[in-house]
Amino acid sequence: MDPRIERLEAVIRARKGADPASSYVASLFAKGTAKIAQKVGEEATETIIAALQEGPDKLTSEAADLLFHLSILLANAGLTFDDILRELERREGVSGIDEKASRKG
């Protein structure tokens, strides 16, 4: 795992139990899954807009915001990026069409 992602996950875990009045991350955890998911959706939308209408610097910034908020959502569910990477590895060599069809079961 990239050490920058490991540091991000460690900071998010550490702030999970912090005072919501003094930590943005703690305040999101305190508001629950729906609020965290809403923030991920907002950041995803901003990332899409940046990709379509802005330059690479703005896209990079918005993608970082998206990754940050996705990290919070994953931590809230007890998941890490290692879990996501394992799922991607599981899908390697499988047609996207076949993989999607296998989830309909």
Where are these regions (language model features)?
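Flexible "arm" and connector segments at domain edges
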Residues: M1-A63, L67-G105
